[in-house]
Amino acid sequence: MNTNMMTRFTAAAFAGIAFTTALRADDWPAWGGSDPGRNMYSPAKGIPAKFEPGKFKKNSEEIDMSTTKNVKWIAKLGSQTYGNTVVAYGHVYIGTNNAGARDPRFKDDKSVLLCLDEKAGDLIWQFTVPKLASGKVNDWEYLGYLSAPFVDGNTLYSVTSRCEVVALNADGQKNGNTGTFKDEGQYMPGPGKPKVEVTAKDADILWKYDMMDELGVFPHNAANSSPLVLEDKIYVCTSNGQDWSHVNIPSPQSPSFIVLDKKTGALIGEDDAKIGPHIFHGQWTSPSAGKVDGKWQIFFGGGDGFLYGFDANPVKEGDGNYMKTVWKFEIVPDDYKKDKTGKPYKYPAPEGPSEIIATPVFYKNKIYVACGQDPEHGEGVGRLICIDPKGLKGDATKTKGALVWEFKDIKRSISTVAIDPATDLLFTGDYSGFVYCIDTKTGKLQWQHDMQAHIWGSPMVVDGKVFIGDEDGDLCVFEASREKKLLNEVNMGAPILATPVVANGTLFVNTQTHIYAIAEGAKAEEKQK
């Protein structure tokens, strides 16, 4: 990100995943729900295409609930919200900033993960994270909490804006301060600040792993990755990147991707890909997983423009433990590297190469992902690819059969695709504001729609519909079919820079400033949360 960026930045039950408690079937417990392949799809039914988000009261950020329709509740967030919603065991988790501070002890800039009651939107607890002293180069002001947690039983795992992987008790401090971490009273205000008394409304940190201290990583402007939990392991991007100069990489030998023990937070292994020296800018992706050739692989979009398939189980090599690269595939085509005269494009030129920020989606043994850049760099060329990882080894960019199809009409994209299993149709968006419907088998475009505003989030497919929002605050609802049919378009009153999700018959949409719980026939409470 460059110094002009003041207010914008982006960041979603399956055999083989061990949950400590049986999930409710219709929960959305992580980025991508219960699917380690991270497909943005829910099998829920009865989700309304039409609703009224309500009107703001005069000279107020409060919404008049009497003007809503099909809205159960609305909760006020901060002033910037890029985090994606997670719903599990009766709790709703959403990351935001500390504007309009809920807790009078903390009135300065902080990152906040809210835990709300799923039925009514009331605050249960909040995780308050102080800003890094190094400032915007690592932790941009007012950006808020970006990571969507992974809820595994009574524990949730997430990445803080301080570049820490944390395990939190889903009950907060309700049952006291549990776990090995006991200093929440000092953690919340930050180093060098007066310690505060821990209350029942505070988060309970079970353990934390500081990636800057332990690994020497240098997050560029923000740490953002939504962890993946597979059996007893946590996989996460480190957010290692450039410094303020946008030329120097302070920590090129630090890992880009790691795996931790979910019980203790101990480092189990790191990637062997040596991505660091080749990072274009920053790394803010989230991993996915799938079984390939009978073994679990972890899929990771690198800051160097390569899609990686790592063996899920680290092996000892020399003095460390490493996730071995099974294969990699370069998403940047040759014509995005040099112009017609052979002169290399200089990053971040609109015609040039991009990294991968979107999450790779594993669906029916294929992987789907697009390339893109920090939105502050503007629009540019893009590429959406479908990869068949079966049998791939080493650099598979030129391997016959690896690339099933490509779609180069898409522009730069940070959206994760959503695929409807009923039709095998893929839906996605790009930063230029276009929504695409593509046949997953052929890569052929079925239709596209211009939302006339930048798209930061991802589409959600549910109940034969596609929900997607844009920077102007418009939420579009399409029929999930080969023929374009716009079912509804409603303005939510503030930018939508995250992804709508569905849990237990309710659609959750978060704008920059509010989160809405939407359900057919819902009667709103009189008072906004």
What are these regions (language model features)?
Residues 24-529:
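Noncatalytic, solvent-exposed loop/strand surfaces
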Residues 1-12:
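Bacterial N-terminal signal peptides that target proteins for export
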Residues 10-20:
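Bacterial N-terminal signal peptides
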Residues 1, 15, 31:
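Conserved S/T- and glycine-rich ATP-binding loop of Class I adenylate-forming
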